[in-house]
Amino acid sequence: MGDSITIIGAGPAGLCCALWLVEAGHRVTVLEKQTGLPEDMRASTFHPATLDLLDGSGVTKTLLGQGTRVRRWQYLRHGHDERIVFDLAAIADSTGHPYRLQVEQFRLTSAIVQRLRDHPGFRLLRGARLAGLEGGRDTVRYRYEQHGESIEDQAQWLIAADGGRSTVRKILGLSFEGSVFPRTSITLVLDHRFQDDAPGLLGVNYVWTDDGHYSLMRVRDLWRFSFSPEDEENPVEAQDAKAAQARLQAVFPRDRPYRIAQLNHYTLHQRCLERFRLGRILFCGDSAHLNSPAGGMGMNSGIHDAACLVEHLLPVLAGKAGEGHLDRYDRRRRTIALDEVQRLSARNYRRHRETDPERRSVIWADLAATAADRERHRDFLLDSSMLRSRQREREID
């Protein structure tokens, strides 16, 4: 086995790093502060570019058996017979997976853990909370707490994939500049046949109401209903179950309450580290950058970070490149985070939450013209599927 790498965080980005490093013959230890893998639906969209990346390890095949393939998705105006449909067949020549896969992110992390659990090069420490960290010239020393004990260890390289509230980032005192979007996002998971209430629904739907918005996405027999508080709503009160029922009844009225399986709310940030590499400490995923979830790019971009990080780390581990080779990982993925992921997700955030009638008319006309024009349709989907960001990443030296 090769050099040892420690990864902080067992989310999608961290475990994808672990998967690809172990497959390449390296020893990996993953520290996860929680005792189990979370099973919420914070992210549920796998874009074509991500499915292509996961194909080689067999993970995509596993996920396909657990999710819903969405080949066509749409914008709708609730209560009006108006829709704009985008068809991923337009980019079938650029991907092996011309569809979005709607499946919970924990299906990915569970699949990777199952794949690696008996591998001698993989060690997952649950309930292990990072408590100290010191980067050196040849190693990274760290301390973690588990089962009431304080344990010291070291690795040749440490990957911080521990999320938006990264402990690694805080221990190192790194600035995480950016801003908070003005509206929270509230997500409900329901076991209800919305397709019977609105027969024109597709697997992914972005919907304007007269004075607000919601999105509705299908994951097998479940639906994920997301919205933001209205302007006049108290944002805290909007997050309780009573307010959620009121929002559901406003768009899909019925004579009894909905059964809500999950209710989650998220504060939305747009932030980015100044550098994704600090010596032998590397950052990826939400620990490195945050963006609006509009368009489903957050988890996907974290997985893309992981692929790019491993691609640059492997030749360094093999002695075929110097440590400076990893600076290109920083340049590539930081540029993509700022110029592609944050730009597109912020545009989606504004588009979905626009309420001014005149500005809505302009947006709607532009989307309709885009969908109707073959080249613009394809161009739009290359961006939204994240295939273009992967292409642009490879053009950055």
Positions of PLM-derived features:
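C-terminal helical "tail/cap" subdomain of flavin- and related membrane-associated enzymes
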Residues: 1, 228, 274, 312-397
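Conserved hydrophobic helix-helix packing surfaces used for dimerization/oligomerization
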Residues: 5-7, 28, 281
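Conserved mid-domain beta->alpha element of the FAD-binding
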Residues: 9-19, 23, 112, 160, ...
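Glycine-rich FAD pyrophosphate-binding loop
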Residues: 22-42
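Conserved FAD-binding catalytic core of PHBH/FMO-like flavoproteins
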Residues: 114, 140, 149, 157, ...
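A conserved short coil-to-beta-strand element within the FAD-binding core of flavoproteins
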Residues: 126-140
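Active-site-adjacent segment of FAD-dependent monooxygenases/related oxidoreductases
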Residues: 42, 47-115, 341
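Extreme N-terminal leader/targeting segments of oxidoreductases
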Residues: 1-5, 23-24
